[in-house]
């Protein structure tokens, strides 16, 4: 059984429905639309939630893993979760890229947010400690900050961190290794209000 969660976001989109079928690098474009429908599916008869009819084992607690991540990651990313639905072996989510939010962050906030996900690098650690950086070091750090700001508004990075975390927990619980997800997530741009409403 699916659990659907929605947040009311008022879209300002075109009136004509369009479906994008380009490669992923072209598919996700904030210039086209900030809204995307993403789907990830499990492999090897793995369970994301629900109960295995053969063994009787319940995996319903895994729903909580995914929900927790879906609600916490937007606190770090400039990406909002507009809706999601969790099925036994896959999940859907509607994501909204908030690029204006990412642009509003100062460099220090970008570094602090990135450090919630990764360790950063030596320069970013020194920067947060308040160490004095040389001009060359500051320029090098700025390159990293610009890249991190971009990643913090990237659906690919959002989904990567989300799915890797769930895969690690599930593989540990199942006492196995290998892929938990069926390849990379699938995404579709929601280019108008009709598409967004239908998906929600």
For each of these PLM feature ranges, what is it?
Residues 1-200:
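Short catalytic/metal-binding and nucleic-acid-binding patches
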């Amino acid at each position: 059984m699916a659990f659907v969660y929605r947040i009311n976001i008022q879209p300002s989109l075109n009136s004509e429905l369009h479906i994008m079928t380009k490669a992923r690098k072209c598919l996700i474009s904030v210039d086209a639309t900030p809204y995307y429908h993403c789907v990830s599916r499990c492999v090897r008869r793995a369970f994301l939630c629900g109960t295995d009819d053969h063994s009787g084992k319940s995996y319903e607690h895994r729903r909580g893993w995914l929900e927790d991540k879906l609600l916490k990651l937007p606190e770090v990313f400039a990406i909002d979760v507009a809706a999601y639905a969790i099925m036994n072996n896959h999940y859907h989510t509607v994501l909204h890229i908030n690029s204006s939010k990412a642009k509003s962050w100062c460099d220090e906030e970008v570094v602090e947010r990135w450090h919630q996900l990764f360790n950063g690098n030596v320069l970013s650690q020194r920067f947060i400690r308040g160490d004095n950086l040389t001009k060359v070091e500051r320029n090098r750090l700025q390159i990293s900050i610009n890249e991190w700001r971009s990643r913090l508004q990237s659906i690919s990075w959002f989904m990567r961190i989300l799915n890797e975390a769930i895969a690690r927990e599930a593989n540990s619980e199942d006492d196995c290794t290998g892929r938990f997800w069926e390849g990379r997530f699938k995404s579709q741009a929601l280019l108008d209000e009709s598409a967004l409403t239908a998906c929600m």
